[in-house]
UniProtKB/Swiss-Prot annotation:
Its main location: mitochondrion. It comes from Sorex pribilofensis. Heme b b562 binds at H83, H182. This is Cytochrome b. One of its GO terms (molecular function) is ubiquinol-cytochrome-c reductase activity. The gene is MT-CYB. It is found in: Mitochondrion inner membrane.
Length: 379
């Protein structure tokens, strides 16, 4: 008799995705982050669900409801900090996952890559709205500054901002709708992740060499299930260490002050995972230009497949491209650092140079270097 997991319509989908899936025999630990992102999403949805049971999306009670969760709810502090630091882990895994895709040429799977870019936008939108919910100083002013950027859109800008606010400033209506969107978006993200996997399984996984691995496939289970479980255990170890030893390490002290529209914090800045984009936004003196640069800093990923000029898919055998890739990583770290600094000399000029280098590397230097490496193959 044929195994039930192969005949049952539902079990067969799970079987062909996680058990009998033919996988390349040489994929490294850089391929673990997809499953880790899935775990992060599950953790975020579950902790978020329990937080939503006690949270109130009203400007008068939002801050005190979060305090109530931490003080009075059984293990509320644990749920709250798992959710807050889980977001940081989510973005660490996301950045490493995207970096892996860039390094090994996984972006050549166009549909998978584009759904991935869409997922990145959705996760960033969700995280931004989630940061507004505790209604601390940084929540309020972060929401005010970022939503205000839409006023740079010609003609409809100011109307659009008031429409999003639900009034003439960030207030009760804004908080309520942000809570509604923050609640629904993770489920949309889960659906998109399903589409992401669907497209991936149409082609099969890429591998470090970038070569076709059809001749040498192994079943996903037990080889990669065990490998993924190790990754999950390490993720849980880092997350729990962060939550139990220094839960506020990645947060902003200003968010422990209730929102006050009459008092602006000295340095308005988003969470650490948005600092690179925030630095790019600030480095352009023009408002509309800054907004465009901010959007393009992520949207530029969508054009990467069309800028692939190399005859090789992966960077594994391309030392010059590797060098540029690690310069890009260093540049992003520099931008992240600049985003958290005040707008003054020398940070302004460093931010502007790092922003120029970011776009220059992706749009110009990497494609040119790939062409140069193609010529080296002829020698």
């Amino acid at each position: 008799m044929t195994n039930l997991r192969k005949t049952h319509p539902l079990m067969n989908i799970i079987n062909s995705s996680f058990i009998d899936l033919p996988a390349p025999s040489n994929i490294s630990s850089w391929w673990n982050f997809g499953s880790l992102l899935g775990i992060c999403l599950i953790v975020q949805i579950l902790t978020g669900l329990f937080l939503a049971m006690h949270y109130t999306s009203d400007t008068m009670t939002a801050f005190s409801s979060v305090t109530h969760i931490c003080r009075d709810v059984n293990y509320g502090w644990l749920i709250r900090y798992l959710h807050a630091n889980g977001a940081s882990m989510f973005f660490i895994c996301l950045f490493l996952h995207v970096g892996r895709g860039l390094y090994y040429g996984s972006y050549m799977f166009l549909e998978t890559w584009n759904t991935g870019v869409l997922l990145l936008f959705a996760v960033m939108a969700t995280a931004f709205m989630g940061y507004v919910l505790p209604w601390g100083q940084m929540s309020f002013w972060g929401a005010t500054v970022i939503t205000n950027l839409l006023s740079a859109i010609p003609y409809i800008g100011s109307d659009l901002v008031e429409w999003i606010w639900g009034g003439f400033s960030v207030d009760k209506a804004t908080l309520t709708r942000f809570f509604a969107f923050h609640f629904i978006l993770p489920f949309i993200i889960a659906a998109l992740a399903g589409v992401h996997l669907l497209f991936l399984h149409e082609t099969g996984s890429n591998n470090p060499s970038g070569l076709c691995s059809d001749a040498d496939k192994i079943p996903f289970h037990p080889y990669y299930t065990i490998k993924d479980i190790l990754g999950v255990l390490l993720l849980i170890l880092v997350l729990t260490s962060l939550v139990l030893f220094s839960p506020d390490l990645l947060g902003d002290p200003d968010n422990y002050t209730p929102a006050n529209p009459l008092n602006t914090p000295p340095h308005i800045k988003p969470e650490w995972y948005f600092l690179f984009a925030y630095a790019i936004l600030r480095s352009i003196p023009n408002k509309l230009g800054g907004v465009l640069a901010l959007v393009l800093s992520i949207l530029v990923l969508a054009v990467v497949p069309f800028l692939h000029t190399s005859k090789q898919r992966s960077m594994m055998f391309r030392p010059f491209s590797q060098c540029l890739f690690w310069i890009l990583v260093a540049d992003l770290l520099t931008l992240t650092w600049i985003g958290g600094q005040p707008v003054e000399h020398p940070f302004i000029i460093i931010g502007q140079l790092a922003s120029i280098l970011y776009f220059l590397l992706i749009l110009v230097l990497m494609p040119i270097t790939s062409l140069f490496e193609n010529n080296l193959l002829k020698w």
